[in-house]
């Protein structure tokens, strides 16, 4: 059955196995020597996991070996529903980009020129920062600047 499993079904198995075994996302990331958020995102179906690393994770999670090629296959990225997210944590990122997205775009254009921040040549990090009024969540997006290049196909 697992060989015919979809990536979404495998993701559900990963979440259940991780909880059942009492593993943290950090422990899984450490097992393969990859960053925490990359590993978590990959295990949630957003990045392909090289087979040699997939084998380590499958073993650690107690999953069938036939999960390895499913993990290694290029995923359908951005698989979140297109509606406004309802999960409170994810919604706060949506809300923050509604409030600050325009300003971020303007300042990127002012400091870098006309272009975008890559989400392909990209990393993300999360840190916990102690604060007297309550711990802070510090999220860092680190993406390569990609200038728009308007080129005619006839050139």
Curated annotation (Swiss-Prot):
Entry EC number(s): 4.2.1.104
EC class: lyase
Alphabetical keyword list: Lyase
Catalytic activity line of the entry: cyanate + hydrogencarbonate + 3 H(+) = NH4(+) + 2 CO2
GO process terms (BP): cyanate metabolic process
Xref: SMART domains: Cyanate_lyase
Active site per database record: 92, 95, 118
Any Pfam family the entry gives: CYNS_N
InterPro entries xref list: Cyanase, Cyanate_lyase_C, Cyanate_lyase_C_sf, CYNS_N, Lambda_DNA-bd_dom_sf
GO molecular function per UniProt: cyanate hydratase activity; DNA binding
Amino-acid biosynthesis in keyword set: no
Superkingdom to which the source organism belongs: Bacteria
The keyword Magnesium is assigned to this record: no
Its job: Catalyzes the reaction of cyanate with bicarbonate to produce ammonia and carbon dioxide.
Entry's family note: Belongs to the cyanase family.
Protein name in UniProt: Cyanate hydratase
Organism: Mycolicibacterium paratuberculosis (strain ATCC BAA-968 / K-10) (Mycobacterium paratuberculosis)
């Amino acid at each position: 059955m697992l060989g015919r499993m979809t990536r979404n079904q495998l993701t559900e198995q990963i979440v259940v196995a991780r909880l059942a075994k009492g593993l943290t996302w950090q422990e899984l990331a450490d097992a393969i020597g990859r960053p925490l958020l990359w590993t978590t995102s990959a295990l949630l179906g957003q990045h392909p996991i090289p087979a040699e690393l997939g084998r380590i994770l499958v073993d650690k999670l107690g999953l069938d070996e036939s999960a390895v090629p499913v993990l290694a296959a290029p995923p359908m990225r951005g698989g979140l529903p297109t509606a406004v997210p309802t999960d409170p944590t994810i919604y706060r990122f949506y809300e923050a980009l509604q409030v600050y997205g325009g300003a971020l775009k303007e300042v990127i254009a002012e400091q870098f020129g006309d272009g975008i921040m890559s989400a392909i040549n990209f990393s993300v990090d999360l840190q916990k920062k102690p604060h007297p009024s309550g711990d802070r969540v510090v999220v860092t997006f680190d993406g390569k600047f990609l200038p728009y290049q308007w080129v005619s196909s006839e050139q």
